[in-house]
């Protein structure tokens, strides 16, 4: 991530996972949509109640396995609910914040079909900014899942109070790995997720770039060559990613 390019805002479609793993969308105040028939239909039972960041994940057959967010506008720490709309064991009061822009990101563990990593980012406004990850094992609780590890602090914990609300992922050049990316000030932190787990970070410093406001979004182009950072108050920038 070396070159800073001035550019207009572009929206990229992030094709990280197979199509059916995004067949359920859980968002907002108890809202959910099922895309399995090709036409979005309401899904009932959501316990989610959030104005901003949230996440949901389905299996390769398009069946919901869990979703992530907050149960109310007051309780901003994250909860992970299973497909029965019940909190997972160890899945209540997690690090992160439902008021952060990108809040939670799920990445399937390569080579371990029942393991998922959930990456979370907090928010400065509630004094819980930072970057962490948790591990979910879907073989637990009769297939409904359990949060078996975490929180693991990522980035530089000494700078967590100034961490941004941005996190994204893209498939690596080798098909059985992913890159997970977040940022702080003038630095981008990239973590390779492969069969060995979550690797140590690779840090890139961008001269002349700084995030004044933590809010915004990170996205990677589908070919994995460009990273776009849309920042509140400090514009939108595109970088080479390799």
Model-derived segments and spans:
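Asp-box/WD-like beta-propeller blade repeats and closely related beta-sheet repeat scaffolds
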Residues: 123-183, 194, 205-209
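Beta-propeller domains
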Residues: 19-101, 107-111, 120-147, 173-242
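Structural signature of eukaryotic scaffold interfaces centered on beta-propeller domains
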Residues: 19, 49-63, 95-114, 157-177, ...
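Hydrophobic core segments of beta-strands in well-ordered, beta-rich domains
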Residues: 24-28, 58, 65-69, 112-124, ...
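Residue-level marker of positions within ordered structural domains that often coincide
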Residues: 6, 10, 61, 138, ...
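Bacterial Sec-dependent N-terminal signal peptides
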Residues: 1-24
């Amino acid at each position: 991530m070396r070159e800073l390019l001035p550019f207009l805002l572009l929206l990229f479609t992030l094709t990280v996972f197979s199509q059916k793993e995004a067949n359920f969308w859980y968002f907002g105040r108890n809202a959910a949509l099922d895309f399995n028939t090709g036409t979005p239909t309401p899904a009932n039972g959501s316990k989610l109640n959030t104005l901003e960041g949230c996440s949901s994940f389905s299996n390769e057959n398009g069946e919901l396995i869990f979703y992530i967010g907050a149960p109310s506008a007051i309780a901003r720490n994250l909860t992970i609910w299973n497909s029965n709309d019940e909190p997972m064991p160890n899945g209540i009061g997690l690090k992160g914040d439902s008021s952060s822009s990108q809040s939670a990101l799920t990445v399937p563990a390569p080579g371990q079909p029942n393991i998922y990593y959930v990456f979370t980012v907090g928010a400065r406004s509630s004094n819980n900014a930072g970057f962490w990850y948790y591990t979910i094992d879907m073989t637990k609780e009769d297939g409904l899942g359990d949060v078996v590890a975490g929180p693991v602090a990522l980035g530089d914990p000494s700078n967590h109070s100034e961490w941004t609300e941005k996190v994204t992922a893209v498939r690596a050049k080798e098909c059985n790995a992913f890159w997970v990316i977040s940022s702080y000030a003038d630095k981008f932190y990239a973590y390779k997720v492969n069969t060995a787990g979550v690797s140590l970070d690779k840090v890139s410093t961008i001269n002349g770039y700084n995030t004044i406001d933590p809010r915004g979004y990170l996205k990677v182009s589908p070919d994995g060559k460009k990273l776009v950072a849309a920042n509140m108050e400090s514009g939108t920038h595109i970088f080479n990613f390799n």
